[in-house]
Amino acid sequence: MNAGTAPPTSTAADRPLRADARRNRERVLAAADEAFALEGPGVPLDEIARRAGVGAGTVHRHFPTKEALLQAVLVGRLEGMLAEARAALAAADPVESFFGFFRIMTDYAQNKMDLAEALGRQGVDVRAVTHDVATALRRALDELLTRAQDAGAVRADITVDDLHALVVGTVAAVRASAPQDAVRVGALLSDALRPGKG
């Protein structure tokens, strides 16, 4: 290195968070996730800070805008769903693991879609924001589906794209139904995936 050349410096974004800062960020994300799930994405940042037990400045340091927090919660939910998919892949029974994960995916979608729709209304490219985790999730879902089809438990003509379309349709149907009908709607959908039901 030349004497007149300064060593490269890392930016704040490059440096790992201190343990206390990381804990605060996790508390904010947990509070936001719960608040958005219960009350929708309109909960203000100051209220998120109160529920997380941190100052408003702490929230703004980690998430300068409401949009940034919504994006982080959305990605976090997809990462949670990916972890569930990987756990299902590790299970011995390909049929139960597929249908169990499909129920989880439908439940997740009811909350995830609210955030995705809110971000879309703000002009955010949701597909770009979630690309990496969504790609990994699609691969895991494809493997779960293939295993269930090989076991003869799911129609051979069903694709991952079909599953996504069915989940979106199911969420819409559940939203339009009485709360007590949600389980029945989900059961009807699972039944439609089985051979001989199409």
Indicate residue ranges for each PLM-predicted region:
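C-terminal peripheral helix-coil segments that are non-catalytic and often amphipathic
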Residues: 1-12, 107, 139, 143-154, ...
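Basic, helix-initiating cap at the start of DNA-binding domains
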Residues: 1-51, 68-71
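Helix-turn-helix/winged-helix DNA-binding modules
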Residues: 40-41, 61, 155
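Short hydrophobic/aromatic patch on the recognition helix
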Residues: 53-63
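Conserved terminal C-lobe alpha helix of the protein kinase catalytic domain
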Residues: 71, 75, 79, 86, ...
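Hydrophobic alpha-helical connector segments
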Residues: 72, 83-111, 125-129
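Short linear capping/connector segments at secondary-structure termini
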Residues: 117-126
